[in-house]
């Protein structure tokens, strides 16, 4: 990509929000993933619902969904969008790793990649916040876009 291809800059080389007025509305979907590593006791207590602050996964799920809907308030050049679906799921390895996956969908003029990435990031931060008293060494890693569909650029799938 050439420097001139960057769309978030105006002629004065200052930031701008991209004009999507003439773009067609299409179904757009994005899936993102993040992993949080923790000690075995922390994961076991999360899964057993034994964290003093409450149901960690339920709170993280709601936080991730809320984050997807509020992305344009956090990321300056993101367009406000009408989210038609936001879902968060969790998968653990039974030891020290919890994987968070988000799926965000809209019918609109711009994609939802940032919404999906924001959702998993905030869900992971919520888990950290709720468990930091017992495990300050948790690590949030491997946050990435898994897949996106729709729009002019078509389908993207991350390499496995």
Curated annotation (Swiss-Prot):
The keyword Isomerase does not apply. It catalyses: (8S)-3',8-cyclo-7,8-dihydroguanosine 5'-triphosphate = cyclic pyranopterin phosphate + diphosphate. InterPro entries: MoaC, MoaC_bact/euk, MoaC_sf, MoCo_biosynth_MoaA/MoaC, Mopterin_CF_biosynth-C_dom. One of its GO terms (molecular function) is cyclic pyranopterin monophosphate synthase activity. GO terms for biological process: Mo-molybdopterin cofactor biosynthetic process. Pathway: Cofactor biosynthesis; molybdopterin biosynthesis. It comes from the Bacteria. Belongs to the MoaC family. PANTHER family: CYCLIC PYRANOPTERIN MONOPHOSPHATE SYNTHASE, MOLYBDOPTERIN COFACTOR SYNTHESIS PROTEIN A. This is Cyclic pyranopterin monophosphate synthase. It comes from Listeria monocytogenes serotype 4a (strain HCC23). The lineage of its organism: Bacteria, Bacillati, Bacillota, Bacilli, Bacillales. The gene is moaC.
């Amino acid at each position: 990509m050439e420097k001139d291809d960057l769309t978030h800059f105006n002629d004065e080389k200052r930031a701008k929000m991209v004009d999507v007025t003439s773009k067609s509305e299409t179904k757009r979907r994005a899936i993102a993933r993040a992993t949080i590593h923790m000690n075995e006791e922390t994961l076991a207590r999360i899964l057993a619902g034994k964290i003093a602050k409450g149901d960690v996964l339920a709170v993280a799920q709601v936080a991730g969904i809320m984050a997807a809907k509020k992305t344009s308030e956090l990321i300056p050049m993101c367009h406000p969008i009408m989210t038609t679906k936001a879902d968060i799921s969790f998968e653990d390895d039974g030891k020290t790793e919890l994987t968070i996956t988000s799926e965000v969908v809209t019918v609109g003029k711009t994609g939802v990649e940032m919404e999906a990435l924001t959702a998993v990031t905030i869900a992971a931060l919520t888990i950290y916040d709720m468990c930091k008293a017992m495990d300050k060494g948790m690590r949030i890693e491997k946050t990435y876009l898994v897949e996106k569909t729709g729009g002019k650029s078509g389908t993207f799938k991350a390499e496995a």
